[in-house]
């Protein structure tokens, strides 16, 4: 028999993810703490088969102008094990959905949005479809495909498998005495990084994360020493940066920005390589470059250029089922229409 309970112990939550391959920090305990800092209500739900914890879902209540909804980013996460129940994946999603529907109705939500890291195949799409989910008009502010690199080989092996140009630029910037990389846990350096993001946002005409968002994310993960701000300097001037999270054996290249004025110096290559080396030092097995789109199939997509840059470091693509919505009432239609228009405007 499957039952759903709230999880209140951090260690129980974090240990669950140790043997999970497809995971991101958007389902971590600390991300829940971050959401609370952002004044969002959360639920940490676990599905049990008897005494065994087999599924987790960090659920966040989002209150937006277009409507209120429940969000499960990069979850629910199902543990790979020998279940006693037939058709286990379907049954797990079903019992969890029933709990989410209760929460959603109590909170006045118009829909439930999930983006589980399940392989994008017919079996998984069928399960979600049969439960009443429908493909969302936009992704849940988190990727549906990413580029990942196994970083267990030596540094030299990793370099040897990179694109020739990428390897050359890493070595070139490493030797350049005018270029230096700083690894920081300082809020002052985070402010410098945030200025770079504002510069990129203005150049590319998009709304960046607020400093409150970046600061809260940084401080929450910093408590456990699981985040660093990387700054690439040219003659002591910060011209590139990245915010990297190290969680559950994975390094996440969550955010990055650079000053276009210094593009020819190729400093972002050294920033990213330094982050990968740091992830290795922290015994991470994988490095997640955070987001992927086929740059050859969709050359005009906003992520096409960044994806080409990431691919140069070696690795492989990981594609998951599309973000899914479960409507709870007719007001979902308003949200669907607004997001459909936004997607068209953003050309994504």
Give the label of every model feature segment:
Residues 67-80, 107-113:
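Glycine-/proline-rich flexible loop or hinge segments
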Residues 5-50, 56-66, 116-121, 133-140, ...:
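A conserved beta-strand-loop-helix scaffold within acyl/acetyltransferase catalytic domains
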Residues 95-99, 103, 216-329:
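Aromatic (often tryptophan-rich) hydrophobic motifs at membrane interfaces
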Residues 93-146:
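Non-catalytic accessory segments adjacent to catalytic cores
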Residues 77-78, 118-119, 293-297:
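Short histidine/acidic/glycine/proline-rich micro-motifs that form metal-
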Residues 6, 10, 20, 131-155, ...:
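Active-site/acyl-donor-binding loops of N-acyltransferases
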Residues 73, 113-115, 254, 290:
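A cross-family glycoside hydrolase active-site/sugar-binding cleft signature
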Residues 78-98, 128-129, 178-182:
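Short, basic, low-complexity termini and linkers enriched in Ser/Thr/Gly/Pro
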């Amino acid at each position: 028999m499957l039952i759903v309970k709230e999880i209140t112990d951090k260690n129980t939550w974090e240990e669950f993810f140790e043997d999970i391959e497809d995971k991101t920090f958007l389902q971590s305990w600390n991300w829940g703490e971050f959401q609370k800092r952002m004044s969002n209500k959360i639920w940490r739900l676990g599905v049990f088969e008897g005494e065994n914890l087999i599924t987790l879902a960090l659920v966040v209540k989002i209150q937006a102008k277009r409507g209120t909804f429940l969000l499960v980013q990069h979850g629910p996460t199902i543990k790979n094990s020998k279940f006693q129940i037939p058709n286990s994946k379907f049954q797990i999603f079903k019992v969890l959905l029933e709990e989410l529907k209760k929460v959603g109705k109590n909170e006045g939500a118009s829909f439930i949005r999930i983006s589980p890291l399940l392989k994008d195949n017919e079996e998984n799409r069928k399960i979600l479809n049969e439960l009443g989910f429908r493909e969302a008009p936009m992704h849940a502010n988190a990727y549906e495909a990413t580029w990942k690199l196994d970083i267990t080989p030596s540094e030299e092996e990793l370099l040897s498998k990179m694109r020739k140009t990428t390897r050359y630029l890493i070595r070139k910037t490493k030797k350049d005495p005018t270029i230096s990389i700083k690894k920081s846990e300082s809020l002052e350096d985070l402010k410098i990084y945030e200025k770079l993001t504002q510069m990129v946002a203005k150049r590319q005409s998009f709304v960046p994360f607020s400093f409150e968002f970046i600061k809260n994310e940084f401080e929450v993960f910093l408590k456990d020493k699981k985040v660093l701000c990387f700054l690439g300097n040219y003659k002591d001037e910060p011209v590139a940066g990245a915010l990297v999270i190290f969680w559950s054996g994975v390094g996440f290249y969550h955010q990055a920005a650079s000053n276009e004025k210094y593009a020819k110096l190729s400093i972002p290559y050294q920033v990213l390589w330094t982050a990968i080396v740091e992830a290795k030092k922290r015994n991470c097995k994988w490095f997640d470059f955070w987001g992927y789109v086929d740059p050859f199939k969709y050359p005009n997509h906003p992520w096409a250029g960044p994806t080409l840059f990431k691919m140069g470091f070696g690795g492989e693509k990981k594609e998951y089922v599309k973000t899914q919505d479960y409507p709870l009432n007719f007001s979902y239609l308003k949200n669907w229409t607004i997001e459909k228009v936004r997607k068209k405007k953003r050309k994504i």
